[in-house]
Amino acid sequence: MRDELVWIDCEMTGLDLGSDKLIEIAALVTDAELNVLGDGVDVVIHADDAALAAMGEVVTEMHSRSGLIDEVKASTVDLATAEEMVLDYIRTHVKAPKTAPLAGNSIATDRAFIVRDMPALDSYLHYRMIDVSSIKELCRRWYPRIYFGQPVKGLTHRALADIHESIRELQFYRRTAFVAPPGPSTSEIEAVAAALDEGKDAPGPSDSASAPPTG
């Protein structure tokens, strides 16, 4: 059974949907085991000088350091072309529309810009999303040792590199926070479900987030 995930990361001139511009989008498709399929796609989208001049100081410094501003100025790719390039790659590995969830970090922000600027791409994706940031936040509360032990991110603020880091982060959580394959037995699952139905606390590990992790 095929069960792909579509990983997307966007770089924008800011986070305001009313005024900011989408200036880079990258995509990678993985299988259910988080193996990357193909080379992916990374597209820098042209924006005019006025849009770049309107960026805040922090965003300007970030995109200058990464080299993205110079690439945006030099790019001749518009939004429609970028959307088709991303869809061409995704369709190579995800044959049926509305079957593959969107995955990434804080992915709702990226999806909002995709909905606004790339409706055909949004329509091809499943409505469900897998947000690695949600797992991060749960680990911070439930398993702080895992949270504080996660791999250091490069923070390049370039779309394709950020996707690779998000995939690596989910691989880390899978090996540390999730039950090892093949998972609990049917009887163990039934016991947890029954306990929750009865309003009881289901048995499980504890790892207080109120203090730095030990051991």
UniProtKB/Swiss-Prot annotation:
For this protein, the Enzyme Commission number is 3.1.15.-
Q: Coiled coil where?
A: none
User: Which family does the entry's similarity section mention?
Assistant: Belongs to the oligoribonuclease family.
A molecular function GO annotation: nucleic acid binding
The record's GO CC annotations read: cytoplasm
SUPFAM superfamilies annotated for this entry? Answer: Ribonuclease H-like (SSF53098)
Keywords recorded for this protein, A-Z: Cytoplasm, Exonuclease, Hydrolase, Nuclease
Residue ranges of every copy of the Exonuclease domain listed in the record: 5-170
* Chief localisation class: cytoplasm
Q: Which domain of life is it from?
A: Bacteria
Task: Check the record and name the Pfam families matching this protein.
Answer: RNase_T
Q: Tell me what gene encodes this.
A: orn
Composition bias, Low complexity = 202-215
Q: Where in the cell is it found?
A: Cytoplasm
Q: What class of enzyme is it?
A: hydrolase
**Name listed for the protein in its UniProt record:** Oligoribonuclease
Task: Summarize the protein's role.
Answer: 3'-to-5' exoribonuclease specific for small oligoribonucleotides.
Q: Where is the active site?
A: Y127
UniProt cross-references to InterPro entries, sorted A to Z: Exonuclease_RNaseT/DNA_pol3 (IPR013520), Oligoribonuclease (IPR022894), RNaseH-like_sf (IPR012337), RNaseH_sf (IPR036397)
Q: Where is this region: Disordered?
A: 196-215
